[in-house]
Amino acid sequence: MLNRADEVAGIVYLSEVLNKDAASLSHGQKQWLEIGMLLMQEPKLMMLDEPVAGMTLNERKQTAKLLNTISQGRSVIVVEHDMNFVKEVAQTVTVLHQGAVLSEGQMADVQNDPKVIEVYLGH
């Protein structure tokens, strides 16, 4: 188990702070710690709610890289409002409106979907 913890700490950029108290970690590091705790269970599916909320630009970039790495061999569902971040990590984008799927597909297709434009841009 300890070897797995060391391995996961490396994946989520926490090797250097592995022995620190979680309260002393930055916001981004705390998010990575939570992702690491999920990875310890070796899930086939991960669901992350706004994983980059409150992160610095550098932490956001590292998180995008992390999600691209951990999505190899598993499905990762990310709920996120930051479309610039979504562009970096998503293969498929689903836009919901009032609990129903409004549009789904590649980012460019979704962004140009007239329904999405009408609902979110009011045009």
Task: Report each predicted region and the residues it spans.
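Catalytic Walker B motif of ABC-type/P-loop ATPase nucleotide-binding domains
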Residues: 46-50
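A short, surface-exposed alpha-helical micro-motif characterized by mixed small hydrophobic
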Residues: 86-88
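Helical segment within the ABC ATPase nucleotide-binding domain
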Residues: 60-72
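Conserved catalytic motifs of ABC-family nucleotide-binding domains
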Residues: 42
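Conserved ABC ATPase signature
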Residues: 21-25
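Conserved ABC ATPase "signature" region
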Residues: 1-17, 65
